[in-house]
């Protein structure tokens, strides 16, 4: 049958194609409802996943535990199960299952073993299967075990199972003891001890919808990848209540789980990965065989898991590993049925005694990175989402990713609580290692604590090697000198190679491959070191290695190319995470990122959430490295944080004693950008450079540390060399920025920059208590007699050549808040505060200052900057612009604030080698303060304010002039001084320094007892070639022509009023006001005018006049003519306010009266049935009076309450009483007269009222009479006044308290013109009223400023209002509303004008005050209403408007009546 027809071929192939298609299209669903514990046979423990994948429906609490296919552990496990056979769990199936297994095992013992990954036809007989295995032998690559697949027997067994239900059973009865103890060779060289999926099909676990289920996989230890689960296809776990993987181990990768595809874990309430481990077996050099054939029981063959040899031998022999179960002696004493591996080759995992032909691995086969992923290893994306709790604790890996290793992306999102605790790794990523790491939508807590990336302790490694034993699991780390190389795929090791040849070849390949995988990390000196996955320098050099390439140890918690933490709404903590190089000597590793290492960028963004993150006590450290140590908490080229964050007690420390680089970034280390917003706090962080933030770029370009919005606090950080914040460019634009008590060994304890710095205050910026003093550094400090300045800010170009001619810009902008420098100190001896000097800013700096209106930039410490400019003219140097507008078209309207230099706390002699231009605002030199500049130019509209003893001077390095157009001299400081002779205060000085003796120094130097007048302080010598440049000291020829130009106004001010209280002013004298150059060629004074406080209003009064003759003597003097002494400044006062308060008292009594007549005595009351009534009322008054010839403008407001009780003894009589309280406030504005009145009052009033109708007989004979209604009110009031008068121009006030007594009587007679009729309730009345009021103001005396006495006075008024009223009712829905409206003309037939006498006590001056009262003619309008809600309750209210030519009054009454 050499040839067949096409039809026959198709017919023969059709069943196979159909079967394959059916299998591929269907994923098996299996119920997982029972647990398994312990077995030396993978066939009875491991779930083998079919080719098309499987879906496990977990029902109840299911666990897999206590399994190992590691040879030594497998033998021990078999012995333990022989002793306790009832603990073994086997498959639940029909009885023919056990016999089938026995048959399969017998066949495999009689045939050569091998894996057949492509065997699919499960209908073949066992004999055919055996033949197929024999004829398909292929040579496998040593790294194939990661993808090894089950044997055909296993596949056939699994496919023939009638059911996949798992349940616990005892051992099959009748099984021999030998059968129970005999280890099964299937799956002994692979991973996935519990679930093994060698195909592309998906593997998934779902929850049984009928119950909450959990899955626990524990104490499963395998040779291959994935201690508990291995899947070549996608792996997903969904909907479980709990998922726990604990104490699993892999000797390759993925201590608990390993997947060649994606991993998705979602909607699982609780996820726990604990104490899972990846530990490649250590190669034991003393026991390596010398026989190259590799015989000695193995017949020179390699097993199907030879890739385990490659990975394990890539690990350094010094690496620690977990202790295997049982010792070598125990293994040798196991049952004869189990062939032991050669003790000389412990890195081989095969337990077979027969030669095992292996398949050739495809060239593109995937290899897991050995020693990585302590809990999870994922080739594709790993996603954990929608869980309540996720915990990874005490997982470990010898290489990368102590808990999780991902070759691509890791995403942890929508988790309530996420915790990584005490995970360790030997190189990178103590908890997580991936290309991209994203943590998002963490709701409650995000915790990374005690995670570590470290090399093992060198002494423990040596000890373990000498004693031929392994270190403990806590220390097993991979310090091999390379990663897995692609060369392994093309250079397979034949089975004839000995163990020693394996080790040698693997080391060589790893060393050469490390060059291509290296990472470029900048050194602290600006150079670049190539660091990657190469080993530490303690390892011997190998072929192909490059000693200049540094190995990276980093990411104590997280290592990734890009790391993102997003939308954190809870609280995040990174604490006690460490990246540590323990190598005692000879290390060249770079140690980076104690908590987080991001190779390209780190982003922390809370978005709209309210989350915060704390980084505390994270560390990068090394004992001996000559590489770079940086980023105690975070290291990344680019760091962006837009969430509130705290960094506390993080450190970057290098303990080596020689050839070391400066550590940088105690909290954050970067090489490109650091951007923080929404606030941050840095406290007690430590590094050589940038104890809080260190940005050291590879090139000096645009690398920036940027702090925007929010509040920033830098407190008690310690720079072992320089700076809390170290960067080329520093930009701060924050609401609050505080640098407090930071310490450094050299200049710039708060900020050190090498290119540019901008500090803008939106609320407050404070530099206080920062200290430069010798402290213990990790590198050698610069020696020499060097002046230390710039305790807060230091700027110097990172170029030691001295060829740079530009200075570094430093901009200080107080746009929304103040900027202050105080108590920033250099202390040569840390314990001796007596030798301290205080200087805030120094270095080769070009300053610019801007302060908005009302804002201040204050320097309580000196400024000592230097310059790289040279020349004999001031024009050759930089300009310091003060308050220059950013808009060239505007006139400096944006910045009109104050720049202040003060010696209030200590001596302040500032030296700024720049040409100062004061564009706008004020420059203040406080008492005894000196400012030395190259030149000074004051623009129009600006103000120069000098206090006694202050000095404005040029410098001797170049000729420069002082142009002063408007000088203000503050006279506040009082006292005689020996330097000023008989003058009562030390005058300020405009000084010109002679430049003819200039030595040519371009840096600023203060003359002192220790420094010659023409000497220049030497800048701090460089730490290394890129950190500090020695200040250039050019030589310049002598120059002349320095002049003071004094023009315009000299204004004297005494804001506190202290100067003119000096008894020395009690006589005529001359007072020196300003010291000028005595050489008339250096002074030009034109149109000088003396203004300001030259005629004081209190104290020793007199007049100051300018003495023009003294200008020739280099001093401006004033002639003082004494007049008299006044305790108080005289302010003319109208005095009307106190008398005018009578009107407010009268108005509050009138308001009560209006409520009683209009509401309580309303006409409708007399038509009601006789009942008693309780009235509760609210009252309000507003009086406004315009100013006139005899009165001033005044307003009065009052509010109060009234309670009344009345009765009707008869139908026609109402009698009642009321009690009222009013609280009022009056105000009078007289700003043009420099004072304001504000008064308050409260009054108590008692009233009685009554009313009764009667008839007036008109014609007695005809019986005609006129019906009239009589209403009356009598009130007595007590009013208490309390008033304060402010005098803003003299900052004084006085107080007055007095009482008023008042009476008010009103009698109203009303006549009805139209009476109500049936169906018509309208009523028209006319009325006349007599109203008399009397208010008596008692005498009183003011207190405080210049008090006055006021006599008593009385205001009386008799008015006769005449009006017309219209009344009627509206009725509907059983509710009755009675309304009344009236208008009246109210002439005053008698009114007096109150006259009050006053006297000023200090001077005896006095007079009379005539109170302004309303005009005699006024009008009144009234409206009242009563709403009857039933027989018992009535709501009522009334409103009265009263007006005349100057006064408008509004009175309101409203409340409720209860009838009883």
From Swiss-Prot:
Species in which this protein is naturally found: Chlamydia muridarum (strain MoPn / Nigg)
UniProt-annotated stretches for the region Disordered: 21-48, 92-212, 279-372, 455-549, 993-1021
Membrane topology: Peripheral membrane protein
NCBIfam families linked: POMP_repeat
Name of the molecule in the record: Probable outer membrane protein PmpC
Keyword field contains Transferase: no
Compartment(s): Secreted, Cell wall; Cell outer membrane
Family from the record: Belongs to the PMP outer membrane protein family.
Main location (coarse class): secreted
Keyword Transcription regulation: no
Signal peptide: 1-20
UniProt keywords, alphabetically: Cell outer membrane, Cell wall, Membrane, Secreted, Signal, Transmembrane, Transmembrane beta strand
Ranges where the Autotransporter domain occurs: 1167-1460
Composition-biased stretches (Polar residues): 97-114, 138-155, 328-358, 487-501
A UniProt-annotated Pfam family: ChlamPMP_M
A single Gene Ontology CC term: extracellular region
Low complexity: compositionally biased ranges: 34-44, 115-137, 290-327, 461-471, 504-548, 995-1018
């Amino acid at each position: 049958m050499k040839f067949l027809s096409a039809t026959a071929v198709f017919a023969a192939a059709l069943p196979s194609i159909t079967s394959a298609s059916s299998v591929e299209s269907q994923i098996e669903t299996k119920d997982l409802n029972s647990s398994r514990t312990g077995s030396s046979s993978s066939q009875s423990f491991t779930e083998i996943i079919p080719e098309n994948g499987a879906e496990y429906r977990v029902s109840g609490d299911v666990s897999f535990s206590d399994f190992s296919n590691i040879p030594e552990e497998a033998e021990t496990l078999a012995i333990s199960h022989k002793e306790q056979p009832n603990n073994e769990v086997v498959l639940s199936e029909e009885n023919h299952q056990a016999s089938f297994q026995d048959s399969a095992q017998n066949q495999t013992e009689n045939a050569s073993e091998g894996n057949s990954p492509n065997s699919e036809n499960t209908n073949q007989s066992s004999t055919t299967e055996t033949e197929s295995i024999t004829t398909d032998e292929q040579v496998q690559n040593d790294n194939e075990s990661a993808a090894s697949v089950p044997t055909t027997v296993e596949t056939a067994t699994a496919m023939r199972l009638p059911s996949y239900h798992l349940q616990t059973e005892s051992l099959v009865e009748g099984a021999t003891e030998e059968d129970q103890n005999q280890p099964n060779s299937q799956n002994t060289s692979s991973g996935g001890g519990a679930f093994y999926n060698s195909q592309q099909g998906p593997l998934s676990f779902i929850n049984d919808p009928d119950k909450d289920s959990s899955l626990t996989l524990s104490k499963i230890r395998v040779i291959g990848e994935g201690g508990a689960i291995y899947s070549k296809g996608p792996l997903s776990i969904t909907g479980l209540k709990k998922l726990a993987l604990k104490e699993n181990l892999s000797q390759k990768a993925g201590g608990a789980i390993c997947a060649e595809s994606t991993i998705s874990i979602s909607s699982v309430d609780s996820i726990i990965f604990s104490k899972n481990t990846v530990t490649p077996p250590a190669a034991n050099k003393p026991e390596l065989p010398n026989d190259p054939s590799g015989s000695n029981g193995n017949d020179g063959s390699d097993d199907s898991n030879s890739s385990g040899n490659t990975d394990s031998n890539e690990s350094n022999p010094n690496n620690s590993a977990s202790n295997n179960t049982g010792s070598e002696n125990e293994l040798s004493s196991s049952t004869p049925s189990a062939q032991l591996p050669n003790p000389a080759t412990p890195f081989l995992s095969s337990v077979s005694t027969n030669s095992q032909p292996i398949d050739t691995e495809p060239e593109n086969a995937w290899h897991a990175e050995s020693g990585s992923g302590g809990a999870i290893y994922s080739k594709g994306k790993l996603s954990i989402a929608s869980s309540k709790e996720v915990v990874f604790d005490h997982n470990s890996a010898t290489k990368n990713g102590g808990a999780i290793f991902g070759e691509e992306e890791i995403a942890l999102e929508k988790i309530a609580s996420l915790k990584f605790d005490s995970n360790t790794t030997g190189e990178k990523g103590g908890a997580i290692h991936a290309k991209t790491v994203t943590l998002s939508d963490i709701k409650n807590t995000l915790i990374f604590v005690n995670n570590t990336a470290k090399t093992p302790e060198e002494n423990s490694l040596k000890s373990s090697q000498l004693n031929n034993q392994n270190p403990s699991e806590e220390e097993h780390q991979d310090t091999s000198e390379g990663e897995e190389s692609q060369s392994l795929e093309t250079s397979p090791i034949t089975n004839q190679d000995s163990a020693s040849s394996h080790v040698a070849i693997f080391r060589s390949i790893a060393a050469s491959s490390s060059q291509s995988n290296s990472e470029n990390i900048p050194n602290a000196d600006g150079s670049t070191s190539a660091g990657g996955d190469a080993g530490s320098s303690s390892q011997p050099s190998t072929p192909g290695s490059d000693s200049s390439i540094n190995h990276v140890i980093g990411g104590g918690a997280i290592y990734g190319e890009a790391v993102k933490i997003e939308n954190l709404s809870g609280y995040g903590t990174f604490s006690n995470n460490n990246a540590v190089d323990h190598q005692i000597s000879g290390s060249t590793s770079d140690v980076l990122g104690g908590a987080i290492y991001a190779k390209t960028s780190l982003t922390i963004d809370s978005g709209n959430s309210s989350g915060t993150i704390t980084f505390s006590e994270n560390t990068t450290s090394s004992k001996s490295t000559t590489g770079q140590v940086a980023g105690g908490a975070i290291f990344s080229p680019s760091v962006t944080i837009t969430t509130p964050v705290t960094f506390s007690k993080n450190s970057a420390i290098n303990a080596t004693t020689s050839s070391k680089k400066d550590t940088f970034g105690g909290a954050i280390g970067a090489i490109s950008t650091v951007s923080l917003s929404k606030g941050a706090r840095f406290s007690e962080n430590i590094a050589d450079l940038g104890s809080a933030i260190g940005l050291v770029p590879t090139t000096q370009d645009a690398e920036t540390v940027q702090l925007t919005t929010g509040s920033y606090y830098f407190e008690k950080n310690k720079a072992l060399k320089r700076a809390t914040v170290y960067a080329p460019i520093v930009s701060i634009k924050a609401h609050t920025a505080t640098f407090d008590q930071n310490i450094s060994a050299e200049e710039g304890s708060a900020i050190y920059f090498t290119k540019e710095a901008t500090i803008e205050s939106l609320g407050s910026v404070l530099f206080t208590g920062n200290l430069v003093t010798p402290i213990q550094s990790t590198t050698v400090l610069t020696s020499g007699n060097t002046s230390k300045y710039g305790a807060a800010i230091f700027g110097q170009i990172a170029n030691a050549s001295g060829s740079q001619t530009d200075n570094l810009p430093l901009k200080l902008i107080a746009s929304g808040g103040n900027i202050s420098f105080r108590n920033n100190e250099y202390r040569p001896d840390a314990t001796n505060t007596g030798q301290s000097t205080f200087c805030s800013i120094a270095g080769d700096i070009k300053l610019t200052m801007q302060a908005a209106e009302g804002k201040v930039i204050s320097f309580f410490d000196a400024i000592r900057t230097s310059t790289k400019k040279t020349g004999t003219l001031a024009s050759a140097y930089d300009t310091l612009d003060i308050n220059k507008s950013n808009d060239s078209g505007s006139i400096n309207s944006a910045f009109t604030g104050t720049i202040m230099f003060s010696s209030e706390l200590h001596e302040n002699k500032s030296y700024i080698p720049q040409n100062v231009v004061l564009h706008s605002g004020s420059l203040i030199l406080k008492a005894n303060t000196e400012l030395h500049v190259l030149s000074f130019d004051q623009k129009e509209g600006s103000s120069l304010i000098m206090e006694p003893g202050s000095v404005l001077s040029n410098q001797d390095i170049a000729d420069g002039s002082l142009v002063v157009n408007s000088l203000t001299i503050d006279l506040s400081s009082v006292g005689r001084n020996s330097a000023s002779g008989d003058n009562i205060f030390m005058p300020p000085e405009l000084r010109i320094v002679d430049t003819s003796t200039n030595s040519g120094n371009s840096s600023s130097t203060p003359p002192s007892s220790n420094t010659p007048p023409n000497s220049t302080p030497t800048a701090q010598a460089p730490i290394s070639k890129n950190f500090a440049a020695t200040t250039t000291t050019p030589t310049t020829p002598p120059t002349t022509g320095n002049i003071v130009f004094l023009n315009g106004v000299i204004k004297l001010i005494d804001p506190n009023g202290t100067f003119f209280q000096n008894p020395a002013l009690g006589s005529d004298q001359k007072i020196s006001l300003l010291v000028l150059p005595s050489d008339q060629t250096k002074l030009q004074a034109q149109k000088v005018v003396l203004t300001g406080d030259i005629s004081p209003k209190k104290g020793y009064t007199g007049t100051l006049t300018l003495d023009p003759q003294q200008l020739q003597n280099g001093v401006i003097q004033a002639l003082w003519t004494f007049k008299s002494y006044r305790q108080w400044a005289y302010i003319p006062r109208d005095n009307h306010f106190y008398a005018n308060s009578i009107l407010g008292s009268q108005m509050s009594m009138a308001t009560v009266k209006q409520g009683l007549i209009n509401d309580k005595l309303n006409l409708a009351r007399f038509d009601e049935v006789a009942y008693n009534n309780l009235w509760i009322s609210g009252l309000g008054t507003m009086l406004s009076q315009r100013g006139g010839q005899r009165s001033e403008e005044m307003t009065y407001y009052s509010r109060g309450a009234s309670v009344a009780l009345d009765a009707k003894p008869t139908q026609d009589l109402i009698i009642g009483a009321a009690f009222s309280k009013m609280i009022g406030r009056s105000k009078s504005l007289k700003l043009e007269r420099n004072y304001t009145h504000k008064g308050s009052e409260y009054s108590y009033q008692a009233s009685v009222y009554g009313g009764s109708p009667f008839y007036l007989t008109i014609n007695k004979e005809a019986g005609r009479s006129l019906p009239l209604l009589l209403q009356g009110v009598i009130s007595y009031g007590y009013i208490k006044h309390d008033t304060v008068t402010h005098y803003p121009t003299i900052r004084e006030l006085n107080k007055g308290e007095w009482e008023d007594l008042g009476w008010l009587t009103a009698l109203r007679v009303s006549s009805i013109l139209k009476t109500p009729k049936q169906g018509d309730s309208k009523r028209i009345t006319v009325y006349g009223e007599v109203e008399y009021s009397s208010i008596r103001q008692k005498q009183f005396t003011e207190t405080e400023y210049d008090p006055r006495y006021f006599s008593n006075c009385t205001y009386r008024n008799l008015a006769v209002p005449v009006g017309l009223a219209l009344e009627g009712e509206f009725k509907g829905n059983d509710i009755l509303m009675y309304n009344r409206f009236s208008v009246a003309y109210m002439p005053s037939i008698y009114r007096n004008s109150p006259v009050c006498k006053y006297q000023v006590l200090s001077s005896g001056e006095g007079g009379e005050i005539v109170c302004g009262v309303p005009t005699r003619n006024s009008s009144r309008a009234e409206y009242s209403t009563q709403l009857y809600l039933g027989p018992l309750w009535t709501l009522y209210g009334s409103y009265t408007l009263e007006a005349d030519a100057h006064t408008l009054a509004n009175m309101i009454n409203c409340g409720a009546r209860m009838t009883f």
